[in-house]
Every structure is written in structure tokens, then in C-alpha cells.
Design a protein with these regions (language model features):
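N-terminal pre-Walker A segment at the start of P-loop NTPase domains
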Residues: 1-23, 162, 166-204
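Residue-level preference for short coil/turn positions at secondary-structure junctions
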Residues: 27-28, 80, 209-212, 261
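Glycine-rich phosphate-binding P-loop
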Residues: 31-50, 197-234
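Conserved nucleotide-sensing/catalytic segment adjacent to the nucleotide-binding pocket
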Residues: 1-15, 47, 51-115, 122, ...
């Protein structure tokens, strides 16, 4: 299996939203929680361990960083029931069952403390700057959510949900024949979100796990009830599920993956276009909009333009945060013993492979 990619955090209208806690509680046999500040090589450490596990033929799930999707915040080793994850802010993790299930891997030992203190003023200024940019981004995302809410209300009022329920029941009757071999477990992970590179979605992960794809064309949360129904039906049939929340509104679902069936239901729209060839398309936006008046449609076009403008502003703020964070990491780099970090990564690789 090729590695696949998810997110466990999202930049949402609620601020940073974390799903990292689901890794705790003894769920994994070995959860390594990395501790260390900026620039100490946490992402490189995880990438090195993940690459070694791939070479050993292990199945690896990588967790992208919501602040920088080119960086890693975790790696899960399915065949070992083990994982390594960045446990620092904004997704702080503390062991539930220390050492027996979860344990710290401390990278702060590789800092030259005196060298870092010599750059104290620079480090403080850059830390405060990137945090301020994040606060700005979250204010803008909240505003975007308020604007979007008006459009959603108008579209929900026109949606024939009873018709959608009947269609959902028909799809599930065809697709979920027989029972699964799992326990009906639900793992939650984001497929993407708003980042400094704009809005992204890892549809490549969907295609790697589930070749049979139902594309739900929906920009207003019209499909949330349908997706919840899919989850419940799959659980009842003992299929394990990956439920992917909407990164803008994490209390709602955006995608559901049922890998054992090779079946996925994904949400796609102008902000997150799916360029592949789905098995079926469900045009929920069209179902709602066909009943709108000309004046209502004009208002929706206006709100979409406002949303797009606010999204651009949020991405700009996240880009500014990324620049400040890069500068902060560069300030720390001369203070880090990277040979020591690499040696520790190799020890953890050897320990994992001996399990």
C-alpha cells in the first residue's frame, strides 16, 4: 500500500480544531509524542522514521501539518499499531497511560540553551508575530463563516431532504450488501483545509483507498445528514469507517471512506473541485438552487463573492504566519544538534522494527 495522507487539525471558523486526542487512551500500543520547539527537526524526524517503515514494507499513514501541508505532524504505522506525532502547541498531547501506551520523545535536549538565549529578542519577536497572524486568520475565517451561514440557510430552506433520504437509502441498499470484517470503528480525520497555500484536499488519499467514489456536489452542508446516515449504516454492518469533517465547520461531515468496500462519499464544490471521474455524482446544490427566485440567486452570487474575498484574506494571513514561522525556525537552527536528532531517530527506527 502506498502511503496516504490526512490531517488531524484544521484552521476553522472556530479557530484551530484538533482531532489529535483520538490517538490517546491506550488506542495505540506505542505512541511516541515528540516534544520540542520550532526548528528542532520534528517533521524531519517523523519523515525519516516513516521512510524507514515504508522501506520495511509497512503501511504508513502520514499526518500533514495544517499550518504547512508540506510538513508533517505525525505518522501512523498501521501494522505495528504505533505512531509518532508532534505533541506541541496547538495540538498539545499528554500521555493517558504513560510509557505503557504513550511516551515522550524529547528533542529539547538537542538545543544549545545558551545559543538560543543569545537570540532571545529575535525569537520572542518572531514568535509573537506568527501568533498574531494566526489570530488574524481565525478572525477572518469566523467572518467568512457568518457570511456563509446566510447562504446555507437560504439553500437548506429549498432542499428536498425527504427526496435525498430516499436516494440515500437506495444507494446504501446497493452498496452495503453483506457484513464487514471490522468492528464498526469510526476514525475521524480531515482530508484538507485552508492553508497558507490556499484550500487543499487530499483526494489522492481517497483514490488510493476507495476506487468507487460518489461525488456530492455541495457548497452548503446539504449532504451532512446523508453522510451521517452512511456512517450509521456502515457501522451497523461492521465496516470500519474514516469520517472526515468539514474543516471549516468541524461539527459537520464532508467525506466518508469505507476502505474495506473500496467505497467513498466525497463533497466537492468550486472551492474543492474533484478532477477525477467518480462513479456517480449527486448534485445537491442544483437540487436546492432550482427552487430559488432570481433575487435569491443574485444574493447567493454576492455572498459567494464575499466568501471568496474573505478566503483570500485568510490565506494571506496564514501565508504571513508561515513566513514568520520559517524565520523563527531559521533563528533556532544554529542552536540545534541535528546529528543528535538523527541518531535518536535511528534508535527509534531500530526499536520499532524489532517489535
Amino acid at each position: 500500500m502506498k502511503p496516504v495522507y490526512f490531517f488531524l487539525g484544521a484552521n476553522s471558523e472556530e479557530g484551530f480544531f484538533s482531532l489529535y486526542d483520538q490517538l490517546l487512551g491506550g488506542r495505540l500500543d506505542d505512541l511516541m509524542i515528540l516534544k520540542g520547539g520550532p526548528g528542532c527537526g520534528k517533521s524531519t524526524f517523523m519523515r525519516r522514521v516513516g521512510a524507514a517503515m515504508e522501506r520495511a514494507g509497512e503501511r504508513v499513514v502520514y499526518i500533514n501539518c495544517s499550518g504547512d501541508p508540506d510538513s508533517l505532524d505525525g505518522a501512523i504505522f498501521l501494522d505495528r499499531n504505533a505512531a509518532i506525532v508532534d505533541g506541541t502547541s496547538p495540538h498539545v498531547l499528554e500521555p493517558t497511560y504513560a510509557v505503557a501506551s504513550e511516551r515522550y520523545v524529547d528533542l529539547t535536549r538537542f538545543y544549545d540553551v545558551e545559543a538560543a538565549k543569545a537570540r532571545r529578542a529575535e525569537i520572542i519577536a518572531l514568535s509573537d508575530e506568527y501568533r498574531a497572524h494566526y489570530r488574524s486568520a481565525y478572525r477572518i475565517l469566523r467572518a467568512m463563516g457568518e457570511v456563509e451561514s446566510e447562504r446555507r440557510v437560504a439553500m437548506h430552506a429549498q432542499m428536498d431532504f425527504s427526496k435525498l433520504r430516499r436516494r440515500t437509502d437506495g444507494i446504501l441498499a446497493r452498496e452495503l450488501r453483506g457484513d464487514g470484517t471490522g468492528s464498526g470503528r469510526v476514525d475521524r480525520a480531515f482530508l484538507g483545509g485552508v492553508t497558507h497555500r490556499g484550500e487543499i484536499c487530499r483526494f489522492d488519499t481517497v483514490e488510493a483507498l476507495c476506487p468507487r467514489i460518489y461525488a456530492i456536489i455541495d457548497s452548503a452542508g446539504l449532504g451532512n445528514e446523508m453522510l451521517e446516515t452512511v456512517v450509521q449504516a456502515a457501522q451497523a454492518k461492521h465496516f470500519d469507517i474514516i469520517a472526515c469533517p468539514n474543516p471549516d465547520r468541524p461539527r459537520e461531515l464532508h467525506h466518508v471512506l469505507i476502505p474495506e468496500k473500496g467505497l467513498a462519499f466525497i463533497t466537492t464544490n468550486a472551492r474543492n473541485p474533484y478532477d477525477g471521474k467518480p462513479y456517480r455524482r449527486l448534485r445537491l446544490d442544483a437540487m436546492a438552487e432550482e427552487k430559488l427566485t432570481r433575487a435569491q440567486k443574485a444574493k447567493l452570487r454576492f455572498t459567494r463573492r464575499v466568501e471568496a474575498s474573505l478566503l483570500d484574506e485568510a490565506v494571506g494571513a496564514l501565508s504571513d504566519a508561515k513566513k514568520a514561522h520559517d524565520a523563527l525556525e531559521n533563528a533556532y537552527h544554529p542552536c540545534v544538534d541535528f546529528e543528535g536528532v538523527t541518531a535518536l531517530a535511528e534508535r527509534e527506527i531500530n526499536r520499532l522494527l524489532k517489535q
